[in-house]
Design a protein with these regions (language model features):
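Active-site-adjacent core segments of small-molecule enzymes
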Residues: 1-187
Length: 187
């Protein structure tokens, strides 16, 4: 995600949001959150909305924790390191993000630093809405992701993209996804 936390960071909050969106009204969910002292969730949801210039310009966070070897727990992050930055077009087409990525990769490579943030102290595993303090545990770069210049907007690549899937459960035991949100995702 391009936000450091998952505003609906517990399975219960996520379930409630889906339930109220389908069976009731999103306004009732908003009222419930405010009346139960969870108004900060609404603020986080509003703050997560943005109009990014390009997926290649964004910072990304796993938002949920993962095992890191036998003893450690981490969150993952991708930090853009490309020199080129896109600008927001005056008119946003439905596929403006794809257009921006293609414009970038027509002329420039893209790159990201891949980092891990080690869990320290009481940093929670079960609530993905809580941001782990980066001053207490800064991200440590462990790799660089390099995306060379290329044309990816082709019918063949679009067809391939429709067949791809991702599950955090497809991980080696040393990198098992942790926390309730991840347990629900791999169930």
């Amino acid at each position: 995600m391009n936000h450091p936390t998952m505003p609906l960071g517990t399975v219960k909050l996520f379930r409630d949001a889906v339930y109220y969106s389908i069976e009731r009204s999103p306004l009732l969910l908003s009222a419930k959150l405010v009346l139960t002292g969870q108004g900060s969730v609404l603020k986080a949801l509003k703050g997560a909305r943005s109009r990014p210039t390009s997926p290649l310009d964004l910072r990304y966070w796993s938002t949920t924790p993962y095992r890191w070897g036998d003893k450690d727990v981490v969150k993952y992050g991708l930090m853009p390191t490309s020199q080129h930055r896109s600008t927001l077009p005056a008119t946003l087409a439905d596929d403006y993000l794809s257009q921006a990525m293609q414009a970038h990769l027509d002329r420039h490579d893209a790159s990201f630093d891949f980092g891990v943030q080690l869990r320290k102290g009481t940093m929670p595993v079960e609530d993905a809405a809580v941001r782990w303090d980066e001053t207490e545990s800064p991200f440590v770069t462990v790799a660089r992701l390099h995306i060379p210049r290329q044309t990816f907007r082709t019918p063949e690549r679009d067809a391939l993209g429709e067949t791809l899937s991702f599950s955090p459960g497809h991980a080696k035991p040393a990198h098992t996804p942790l926390g309730g949100i991840n347990r629900a995702r791999v169930a």
